[in-house]
């Protein structure tokens, strides 16, 4: 029975540096998608409620892609799934509005 490995039961040890690194990657992804979707909304000329709906759709799509990428072993990379869905959502909204209004003004106003 030398080929059978015993599965160790017990507490999981989590590296705090790895958790912070993963949070930084999530923040970078959320900021990048917010900037790109804001620029897209501005170029497309979306206004008012349609622009905000576009942001939340883009944010939901990013969250879905992050969940699919992390797979069933999400607990290997994160303490909970909540940061995948809500992490950086409000900060990303500010970035989105900045790019949205700037590109809308450059393309449709001037």
UniProtKB/Swiss-Prot annotation:
Residues 45-50, 107-110 are lumenal. It is a multi-pass membrane protein. Residues 1-28, 72-89 are cytoplasmic. Disulfide bonds: none annotated. One of its GO terms (cellular component) is endoplasmic reticulum membrane. The keyword Transmembrane helix applies. Keywords: Endoplasmic reticulum, Membrane, Transmembrane, Transmembrane helix. Its main location: endoplasmic reticulum. GO terms for biological process: protein insertion into ER membrane by stop-transfer membrane-anchor sequence; tail-anchored membrane protein insertion into ER membrane. The keyword tRNA processing does not apply. It is found in: Endoplasmic reticulum membrane. The chain crosses the membrane at residues 29-44, 51-71, 90-106. Part of the endoplasmic reticulum membrane protein complex (EMC) that enables the energy-independent insertion into endoplasmic reticulum membranes of newly synthesized membrane proteins. Preferentially accommodates proteins with transmembrane domains that are weakly hydrophobic or contain destabilizing features such as charged and aromatic residues. Involved in the cotranslational insertion of multi-pass membrane proteins in which stop-transfer membrane-anchor sequences become ER membrane spanning helices. Belongs to the EMC6 family. Component of the ER membrane protein complex (EMC). This is ER membrane protein complex subunit 6.
